[in-house]
Amino acid sequence: MEQAMLNLTFRPLSSETWPDFEALFEKHRGVQGGCWCVYYLCKSTEFNRLGPEGRHGFHKELALEGRASGMIAYEGETPVGWCQFGTPEVLCQYSRGRAYSKLDIPPEDKPSWRISCLFTDKHRRSRGIAIFTLHAALEEIARRGGGVVEAFPLDAPNV
């Protein structure tokens, strides 16, 4: 399916687009048990302490301050997809994992960016929205200087 056939457009997360991100995630109860795409932005103890409402507020604060990155997909004017990206310093949770810390990554292969989450509205899945959103996020990363992009695939069929 072609992007044009889906009438998709993309906008980076910002204070202007926060209400669209919020609408998409509120429709799905914060996604993944109220994560609000915060899990990789903080320590797991902080994530647990915040709870769903606190995570919502935490991500909103980061977005309004320009410290959260991601790409929102729109079908017409409706937000239908999301791809979170950021630097390793921002998406720091991966680096804290035991397995990751044991990796011997050569300096030239160290990531400049990470992609942590992809989400598509449950009523619009299986139409290719996620792949187009991923491509839009990669284009935005390139626009911001590019470099090595690290991603961690995870299948969450019940989301």
PLM regions with names:
Residues F21, A68-C83:
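Conserved beta-hairpin
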Residues E46-I72, P88-Y94, R114:
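A short helix-loop-beta-strand connector motif used in the catalytic cores of GNAT acetyltransferases and
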Residues E61, T78-R125, V159:
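Conserved acyl-donor/pantetheine-binding loop and adjacent beta-alpha core of acyl/acetyltransferases
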Residues I115, V149-A151:
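Conserved hydrophobic beta-strand within the GNAT/NAT acetyltransferase core sheet
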Residues M1-C42:
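Conserved N-terminal entry element of GNAT/NAT acetyltransferase domains
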Residues A142-G147, D155-V159:
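Conserved active-site alpha-helix within GNAT-family acetyltransferase domains
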Residues I115-T120, S126-A142:
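Conserved acetyl-CoA-binding loop-helix of GNAT-fold acetyltransferases
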Residues E22-G30, C83-Y94, E139-I141:
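Short, solvent-exposed beta-strand-terminating loops
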